[in-house]
Swiss-Prot record:
InterPro entries: PSI_Ycf4_assembly. The lineage of its organism: Eukaryota, Viridiplantae, Streptophyta, Embryophyta, Tracheophyta. This is Photosystem I assembly protein Ycf4. GO terms for cellular component: chloroplast thylakoid membrane; photosystem I. Keywords: Chloroplast, Membrane, Photosynthesis, Plastid, Thylakoid, Transmembrane, Transmembrane helix.
Length: 185
């Protein structure tokens, strides 16, 4: 979501609370829970899953391996749910032409550096750069080239833009607002 006025431009970044992340975390939790239940039922010799008799899988090695994969999947699912809960990666990009300041804010993982804030002056912006790579794993990333700090990515590639035209349009609008040249690679 973008909000603009004559002197201020604010881009809100959604972070990890997206439908796809919810789906992956939920499916991974269910699948890994199923693996743990199958491994446990093969160890106990009891039928914990009604559609699956425990005699079909021996505990060593199949049940043990399924339990291991299930526990690993539960850890990964827990990690995904924590990133969703903490909304890692969300934040905003603020461009204030009146004050001459750019502020990029993102939420990180809990700890000392939970709040990630980058501040710099607009006069230090050299250009608005867009990197476009076509192919199987296509990437479209807008960067801001800062004097002394290099290129800073503005948004994640999977967030808002689906076509090359959309990202180039957004980069052109931002370059016009900031009054800097635009580069497309």
């Amino acid at each position: 979501m973008t909000w603009r006025s004559e002197h201020i431009w604010i881009d809100l970044i959604s972070g990890s609370r997206k439908k796809s992340n919810f789906c992956w975390a939920f499916l991974l939790f269910l699948g890994s829970l199923g693996f743990v239940l199958v491994g446990t039922s093969s160890y106990l010799g009891r039928n914990l899953i009604s559609s699956f008799p425990p005699q079909q899988i021996t505990f060593f090695p199949q049940g043990l391996v399924m339990s291991f994969y299930g526990i690993a999947g539960l850890f990964i699912s827990c990690y995904l749910w924590c990133t969703i809960l903490w909304n890692v990666g969300s934040g905003y990009d603020l461009f204030d032409r009146k004050e001459g300041i750019v502020r990029i804010f993102r939420w990180g993982f809990p700890g000392k550096s939970r709040r990630i804030v980058l501040r710099f002056l607009m006069k230090d912006i050299q250009s608005d750069r867009t990197e476009v790579k076509e192919g199987v794993s296509a990437r479209r990333v807008p960067y801001m080239e800062i004097r002394g700090q290099g290129a800073i990515p503005l948004i994640r590639t999977d967030e808002n833009f689906t076509t090359r035209r959309e990202i180039e349009q957004k980069a052109a609008e931002l370059a016009y607002f900031l009054r800097v040249p635009i580069e497309v690679f």
